[in-house]
Structure formats: structure tokens, C-alpha cells
Amino acid sequence: MSFASDMKNELTRIEVDEENAKAELSALIRMNGALSLSNQQFVINVQTENATTARRIYSLIKKVFNVEVELLVRKKMKLKKNNIYICRIKARAREILDDLGILKNGVFTHEIDETMIHDDEMRRSYLRGAFLAGGSVNNPETSSYHLEVFSLYEDHSEGITQLMNAYELNAKHLERKKGSIAYLKEAEKISDFLSLIGGYQALLKFEDVRIVRDMRNSVNRLVNCETANLNKTVSAAMKHVESIHLIDKEIGLDNLPDRLREIAKLRIEHQEVSLKELGEMMSTGKISKSGVNHRLRKLNEMADKLRSGEPIEL
């Protein structure tokens, strides 16, 4: 199972009281439900491709409204041939939609009904239902961090975004071709959302992966930085050695001033060491890294003049 499927499976096992069951059910039916007319009677069909979500819808309807629910299974014929699970409610359909704030005065509304989110627990339950109905989250082991909740209706998607941001999740809203999404991109905010809706096992797994990824990224950055510094050091040392060999060939190292002669010989003998270490090897007394760099730069300048045929002052 995918990370998102495991998470939804966990969410469907959360025990809720009747009030919070209504809030969760309101999101599930608003986002995955459809109303039809059969034998001059309204029928609600709530559809999902997730078996555990279908069982959740079934149990919540029985818990809150105690009506008969048919559970149908159909085979999807296009693309992925997944099963489609349909919870069908024939009795009291209009009353149920009214009670869940989906139907008002005979008109369907896309906004979240305030009675469904009037306290903290109900807001969490509504967001849990919204995620079960239209949510997805990337596997943190293989992808960039991303969690989203899809809704057919822009007004409803904006409401979900606002609901998320009531918990300072920095959620964004985006219109898609066939609907809208509320989404999170920050790992920390995704963790907060998982905790918010009760996905604690998913949260632990997400945080474990996140810690390992962050550590790996930190190590990679450190290694890259160290490698770059090492390459820079080696390149500079090679240039120093090349310059010193040229000076030795053309005028001889023994003809250099004392302060340049010793550093030149040390660089030839100890090509692998840092400038700081070279400075500590000076027989005339330890000199700083900048002091060593200054003397080696003088040798490079001297070699450049030899290459161009310019006169040198010793």
C-alpha cells in the first residue's frame, strides 16, 4: 500500500462521537456524493476507490442517521481498473443533506456550513473527512513534500484552505482543469496537518523519513562544500608548485630572498598540506595563513613575469 493509502486506512479507524461524525460525513458526502432520482425518490450515492473509506462512510451514516445503506462494488473500466465502492442511501436523503449543511432551503451549497465546524474538534473532523474524500500526499521517501485536497468546487476548496490556515498551515489554493486544490508544500506544515486530523502513525513515519532525508541532505551539502574546498586547495597548490619549479629552473631558489626561499622549498616538499600548516613549519617562526598566502602569491607573480619575459627584482 502507498503512504497515502496507509494513512487513510489509519484515519478510518478513529473513534468519533456523533457530532464529529456529522462533520466528517459532511465533507465526505459533499465531495464524493451525488444526488439522483429513482422511482420519484431522491437517492444519495457516495463514491470512492478506497475500500476503507467506503467502510468509514457506511459506518458513519449508520451511526448518525441509522438508515439502510447499500454498499455496491463496481469495476472501473478506464485506465486503472480499480474497484469503485458506492454507498447508496435511499431513505431520508433530503433530510440527511439538510442536516449535514449540504442542502439549504432546497438549494445545494458549495461553502462549508458553519454548524459543521463550530468548534476545534469538528474542524479537525471536517478536514479529516475532506482528506479521506479528496486528499493525497506524496511518499516522503521518494518525492518532494506535497499534500493536497481536491474539490470539484472552488468555493469549497477555498473554504478548506481557510480552514487549514486557521491552524497556521500556510495552505495555498490552486485552480485545476477539473476542480481546485488546497495544498501544502512545507514538510513541517504537512506534519502538523497529519497530527491535526489524527494520523499519528503516518506522522511518525513521515517524521522518520524527514529526519533521515534532512540529515542526508546536510551531509551531502557538507561533502560538496568540503570537496569544493579541497579542489580549490589542490588547484592552488599545483599552481604554486608549477611556479616554484619555473623559478628554480630560471634563477634558482637559492637566489630568492630568505622569506620567499623557505616557503618555496616547504611548498615543494609538502604539497598536500594546507597554508596554515605551511605557516607552522617555518623555521624563522610561525606565520599566519594570510602571511603564507601573501608569499606564495609573490612567487606566482614572479613566475608570471618570467613567462612573459618581464624583468624581476629580487
From Swiss-Prot:
SUPFAM superfamilies: Homing endonucleases (SSF55608)
InterPro entries: Homing_endonucl (IPR027434), Sporu_reg_WhiA_N_dom (IPR018478), Sporulation_regulator_WhiA (IPR003802), Sporulation_regulator_WhiA_C (IPR023054), WhiA_LAGLIDADG_dom (IPR039518)
GO molecular function: DNA binding
GO annotation (BP), single: regulation of sporulation
Keyword field contains Amino-acid biosynthesis: no
Highest taxon above the source species: Bacteria
Keywords: Cell cycle, Cell division, DNA-binding
Signal peptide coordinates: none
Transmembrane regions listed in the UniProt entry: none
UniProt DNA-binding residue ranges: 274-308
Family: Belongs to the WhiA family.
Role of this protein: Involved in cell division and chromosome segregation.
Name under which the protein is recorded: Probable cell division protein WhiA
